[in-house]
């Protein structure tokens, strides 16, 4: 079994990984859970980029990532197994521990749910998957990558605010967000509670038209 450690986590290959039915023993991991109970983690984003951790601002994104890793790794967060495809179609399996990526990506996607429309989320995810596949298959210099990057950058213009997570040993959960771009707050009303933009008769007409179109 061998391991590769970097800024974005540690990959673990060989040994039990070669058996699709086997998991990894505790000894395979470099970082272990040393905390009990729970605590909240606040990650603040500006245009989709991580800018603050627990309200501490970072000009250097690398230091911000390292701070999240330090906090999350103490709970043993970020352990999982990845199965991927090579360019020639052979599948590979690798274990990993990556507290910072799991927490940052989880917080970012949670914030996107509040600040992007349904179709912005859908197409951003579709394009992001293609971008990841092209990048994995050494197509970074393909001109379409610049087009995809422009779309992804545009999609993040309103992804601003703080996502709040609750950390527990070996896992985390989402709590809420604080954002001036929160689309849950709107002038028409509150979902499941009340509305201010139309009457009951308007709703009946809308249902009738859409159900017969």
Can you describe what each PLM-predicted range is?
Residues 3-213:
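Nucleotide-activated chemistry modules centered on ATP-dependent adenylation/adenylyltransferase
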């Amino acid at each position: 079994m061998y391991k590769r450690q970097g800024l974005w986590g540690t990959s673990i290959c060989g040994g039990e990984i070669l058996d699709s039915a086997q998991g990894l023993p505790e000894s395979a991991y470099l970082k272990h859970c040393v905390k009990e109970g729970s605590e909240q983690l606040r990650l603040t984003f500006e245009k989709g980029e991580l800018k603050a951790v627990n309200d501490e601002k970072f000009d250097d994104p690398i230091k911000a990532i390292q701070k999240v890793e330090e906090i999350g790794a103490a709970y043993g967060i970020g352990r999982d197994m990845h199965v991927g495809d090579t360019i020639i179609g052979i599948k590979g399996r690798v274990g990993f521990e990556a507290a910072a990526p799991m927490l940052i990506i989880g917080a970012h996607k949670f914030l996107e749910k509040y600040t992007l429309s349904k179709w912005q989320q859908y197409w951003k995810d579709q394009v992001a998957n293609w971008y990841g596949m092209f990048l994995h298959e050494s197509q970074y210099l393909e001109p379409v990558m610049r087009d995809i990057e422009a779309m992804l950058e545009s999609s993040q213009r309103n992804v601003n605010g703080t996502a709040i997570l609750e950390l527990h040993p070996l896992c985390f959960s989402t709590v809420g967000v604080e954002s001036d771009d929160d689309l849950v707050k709107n002038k028409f009303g509150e979902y499941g509670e009340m509305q201010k933009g139309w009457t009951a008769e308007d709703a009946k007409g809308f249902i009738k038209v859409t159900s017969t179109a």
